[in-house]
From Swiss-Prot:
InterPro entries: AB_hydrolase_fold (IPR029058), DUF726 (IPR007941). It is found in: Membrane. Belongs to the TMCO4 family. It comes from the Eukaryota. It is a multi-pass membrane protein. The gene is TMCO4. The chain crosses the membrane at residues 203-223, 231-251, 346-366. Residues 542-612 are annotated as: Disordered. It holds the Pfam family DUF726. The keyword Transmembrane applies. Residues 552-583 have a biased composition (Polar residues). This is Transmembrane and coiled-coil domain-containing protein 4. Keywords: Coiled coil, Membrane, Transmembrane, Transmembrane helix.
């Protein structure tokens, strides 16, 4: 595979391929340029980090094989392999800080601390596979060596560019042997695709690894016509095919040919134009008329990676659910019912018998479509699991993010993957927002072997709508979207979004602020309400700095930075709101005598622009047109 040299000045100026030395020999990888003692420290730090990141038995073979390959990659003596294996098994973890200090004192790393990141990335990608656990390790090592994680994004992009320039020559014998093997694999691939068509598409892409060559059309889709012409070598074809999926089509090439079980619609829609070594899939929770009638609308500000998709699923039923929500918005016009509802929520009384009669009278409006979507979201999640397990997306890390029923899709996707072999190394991070799923730790325990990076549970303690749909079982059931998941694991991060999300519908309306709150990068120029700002509307003091801050997000992605769940009192996050807007109640734990917010006052009801009734639940189409302060119950 291609190798690039350590940069002299800035990262974008470094060469993409190895430069020959004066004698015509290729330049050695930067990791091998370190002294033997520092190469030992480099490998030892990787071993210790692996043991801390992946202590589960399911990951032991990966850690052992990774360290064996790294020892060989760094040309260390085989005598050190037992020591490195011991480090990867959890022995000697107290020496991590010592190894970090040794590496930071190395003259090469003093000039350019990205050397280790660059070398470890090259090693992780040398076989055309980018395991999610390897990327988590690279991120962790990058943070330990005090290198901004944005530098890793630059290096990954440069590696992708370097693949365009691979021009490895093949001998006639090697070429003939390769073509013979490819013909066999081609027929096998055609057979599998035929079976997939009969089976409804569940095994499409099963040969997304090295089994199929990258066709010219697929290569042009990824890197353009000029770049495709440069990928004529076996190494370039193998790496690109393995990383980006069968025939280069990736997720955009997947289309469910036939109905699978209860699923009627399942397809991936691109959110971005580029390609990246790691991808993000966003899952929307419902559709509504107006601004949120498309699957991509809530994710306009998402910038977690250069290659992002949204899952389009069961639009008919999600639209019915959205219409049901709007019906409830129009039906709860009575101010007495509104005040009673607010008082009920503020008092923390959410048992079925305490819900206002006016709300219970229209319960069937929401219960029926909600129940249908609950069932279908579980089926869609299981189908998504098989798509990811078949490597339709290629062999690269995947981040999943979803809100409401979209988070439920991801939850059942992880459940299904956990039951299959070889489920490790595919999923990097998952972000579940307002998830209508079980919150008991025992149900989340299997996710530890599936997710390599972070498991973020974003919840709102004052989400009355989620409480209402679970009103008959909320006493026995812990709902993840209402409270933290008490699983003691370095992956799990519970983020209390009560100060950002005033109700369930805000998960779509406040997505930009939510993404920043959970540490996901967003595009610059988006305000807290998810509205695109004009160039002159950024803060006048330091507009460029503000844009940069918005682009990188408020919280950098550091693997394992949160140990266990965050308590509800310490994880409240500030939300920038309109100065005229009344303070939103922070949750259900307030005292019995808590006063009602200003929005509940009969003198100043928020009037819905539908022209019919007040808007107590925050209609997404007219929330920006309400008169007077409106904390709402959306």
């Amino acid at each position: 595979m291609a190798m690039w040299n350590r940069p002299c000045q800035r990262l974008p100026q470094q060469p993409l391929v190895a430069e020959p030395t004066a004698e015509g020999e290729p330049h050695l990888p930067t990791g091998r340029e370190l002294t033997e003692a520092n190469r030992f420290a480099y490998a030892a730090l990787c071993g210790i980090s692996l043991s801390q990141l992946f202590p589960e038995p399911e990951h032991s073979s990966f850690c052992t094989e990774f360290m064996a390959g790294l020892v060989q990659w760094l040309e260390l003596s085989e005598a050190v392999l037992p020591t490195m294996t011991a480090f990867a098994s959890g022995l000697g973890g107290e020496g991590a800080d010592v190894f970090v200090q040794i590496l930071l004192k190395d003259p090469i790393l003093k000039d350019d601390p990205t050397v280790i990141t660059q070398d470890l990335l090259s090693f992780s990608l040398k076989d055309g596979h980018y395991d999610a656990r390897a990327r988590v390790l690279v991120c962790h090592m990058t943070s330990l060596l005090q290198v901004p994680l944005e530098e890793l994004d630059v290096l990954e992009e440069m590696f992708l560019e370097s693949l365009k320039e691979i021009k490895e020559e093949e001998s006639e014998m090697a070429e003939a042997s390769r073509k013979k093997k490819e013909n066999r694999r081609k027929w096998k691939r055609y057979l599998l695709i035929g079976l997939a068509t009969v089976g409804g598409g569940t095994v499409i892409g099963v040969t997304g690894g090295l089994a199929a060559p990258l066709v010219a059309a697929g290569a042009a889709t990824i890197i353009g016509s000029a770049g495709a012409a440069a990928l004529g070598s076996a190494a370039g074809i193998a790496i690109m095919t393995s990383l980006f999926g069968a025939a280069g089509a990736g997720l955009t090439g997947y289309k469910m040919k036939k109905r699978v079980g209860a699923i009627e619609e399942f397809t991936f829609l691109p959110l971005t134009e580029g390609r990246q070594l790691h991808i993000t899939i966003a899952v929307t929770g419902w559709l509504a008329s107006g601004k949120y009638r498309t699957f991509s609308a809530p994710w306009a500000a998402l910038a977690h990676s250069r290659e992002q998709y949204c899952l389009a699923w069961e639009a008919k039923y999600l639209m019915e659910l959205g219409n049901a929500l709007e019906t409830i918005l129009s039906g709860l016009a009575n101010m007495v019912a509104q005040e009673a509802l607010k008082y009920t929520v503020l008092s923390g009384i959410v048992a079925a018998l305490t819900w206002p009669a006016s709300l219970l009278s229209v319960a069937n409006v929401i219960d029926n479509p909600w129940g249908v979507c609950l069932h279908r979201s579980a089926e869609v999640g299981k189908h998504l699991a098989h798509i990811l397990l078949s490597r339709q997306q290629g062999r690269r890390p995947v981040t999943l993010i979803g809100f409401s029923l979209g988070a439920r899709v991801i939850y059942f996707c992880l459940q299904e993957m956990a039951q299959e072999k070889d489920c490790q190394g595919i999923i990097e991070d998952v972000i579940l927002l307002g998830a209508p799923v079980e919150g008991e730790a025992k149900h989340w325990e299997p996710f530890r072997k599936v997710v390599s990076g972070r498991i973020i549970n974003g919840y709102c303690r004052g989400d009355w709508l989620l409480s209402f749909v679970y009103r008959t079982s909320s006493v026995q059931l812990r709902v993840a979207g209402l409270q933290p998941v008490l699983l003691q694991d370095r992956r799990v991060e519970n983020v209390d979004l009560t100060s950002v999300v005033s109700g369930h519908l805000d998960y779509a309306k406040q997505m930009d602020a939510i993404l920043k709150a959970v540490g996901i990068r967003t595009k610059p120029g988006w305000d807290e309400k998810g509205l695109l700002l004009a160039p002159g509307c950024l803060p006048s003091e330091e507009p460029r700095q503000a844009a940069a801050a918005a682009s990188s997000g408020e919280t950098p992605h550091q693997v394992g930075q949160t140990q266990g769940p965050i308590s509800g009192d310490t994880s409240k996050l500030a939300m920038s709101t309109d100065p005229s807007q009344a303070q939103v109640p922070v949750g259900l734990d307030q005292s019995e005598g808590a006063s009602l917010p200003a929005a509940a006052s009969p003198e100043r009801p928020p009037i819905c622009s539908h022209g019919m009734d007040p808007n107590p639940l925050g209609c997404p189409d007219c929330a920006c047109k309400t008169q007077g302060p409106s904390t709402g119950l959306d």
